[in-house]
Curated annotation (Swiss-Prot):
Gene name of the encoded protein: truA
Subunit field text: Homodimer.
Family statement drawn from the similarity comment of this UniProt entry: Belongs to the tRNA pseudouridine synthase TruA family.
Protein name as it appears in the record: tRNA pseudouridine synthase A
Keywords: Isomerase, tRNA processing
GO biological process, one term: tRNA pseudouridine synthesis
Catalytic activity reported: uridine(38/39/40) in tRNA = pseudouridine(38/39/40) in tRNA
SUPFAM superfamilies noted in UniProt: Pseudouridine synthase (SSF55120)
Protein origin, superkingdom: Bacteria
Signal peptide: none
Binding site for substrate: Y109
PANTHER family documented for this protein: PSEUDOURIDYLATE SYNTHASE, TRNA PSEUDOURIDINE SYNTHASE-LIKE 1
Length: 278
């Protein structure tokens, strides 16, 4: 039978999702736990790989097994053998036609950014950080240039293995929690009394290139700090050159929210942690 799992993890201690020699990845830990519970080797396929330090709210994987267990048995049994920073949230039996990657119609990411004159402490590793006030309207205007189908070469890592740089961004939402933003009489980028707040950037697209979200974040923050006007984003996109864009932003605040599937598969589209993020 084929089983799908929803997996959440804090990626701070791992070298990314994909299995590597040494076993210090989320996939290695998950497959080891599944093998101990199922008493046979298990090979998983995920909806979307994440880099070192990137977190997952609802990574979806599938695997094949001769065992027939109840969904919650897979959840509780696998979690028994997982470390505290990885947890299976749900399990569902699925038809053999289901494929965690190929069946996905979209993927979603969120970046949580702390704006504060003081670096994060309890949130360390779980949020990005800027100590300049950001202009939300400017960042939203810049983000609109990225919506739709484009060649995202300017936001692609040199090690990216995707066959094509052409992807479709369906949605970019930028929201703010707290009293931040640019105070009256203070220009973007001024290092005066920066109000503390959290910014949440949410991205939805058919697929993403390696480092694409982090490279977009670098550009959005540059615009938010007043280093470039909003229409600079269009110029970066049209340049089709990584050199045209801002440096890759920190992985700390990046979360893979999970894939979206046709409702006919009957899989959850989010976990409770979605509403926990600022």
């Amino acid at each position: 039978m084929r089983v799908a799992l929803g997996v959440s993890y804090n990626g701070s201690a791992y070298r990314g999702w994909q299995s590597q020699p040494g076993g210090a990845t989320v996939q290695d830990r998950l497959e080891a736990a599944l093998a101990r519970f199922a008493t046979h080797e298990v090979s998983t396929i995920c909806a979307g790989r994440t880099d070192a330090g990137v977190h997952g709210l609802m990574q979806v994987v599938h695997f094949d097994t001769p065992l027939e267990r109840t969904p919650f048995s897979w959840v509780r049994g696998t979690n028994t053998f997982l470390p505290p920073d990885i947890a299976v949230q749900w399990a569902r039996p699925v038809p053999e036609a289901f494929h965690s990657r190929a069946s996905a119609t979209a993927r979603r990411y969120a970046y949580v950014l702390l704006q504060s004159p003081v670096r994060p402490s309890v949130e360390a590793g779980r949020v990005g950080w800027v100590f300049h006030a950001l202009d939300g309207d400017a960042m939203r205007a810049a983000a609109r240039h990225l919506l739709g189908e484009h060649d995202f070469t300017s936001f692609r890592a040199s090690a990216c293995q995707a066959k094509s740089p052409v992807k479709t961004l369906r949605r970019i939402e930028i929201t703010q929690r707290g009293t931040g933003g640019v105070p009256a009489g203070q220009a973007p980028g001024d290092r005066g009394d920066v109000p503390t707040c959290y910014w949440r950037f949410e991205f939805e697209g058919n697929a993403f290139l390696h480092h694409m979200v982090r490279n977009i974040m670098g550009c959005l923050v540059a615009v938010g700090q007043g280093q470039h006007p909003a229409d600079w984003m269009h110029a970066v996109l049209q340049a089709r050159s990584r050199d045209a864009a801002a440096p890759t932003f920190s992985p700390d605040g990046l979360y893979f929210l999970g894939p979206l599937y046709d409702p006919a598969w009957g899989l959850p589209d989010r976990t409770a942690a979605y509403d926990w993020l600022p």
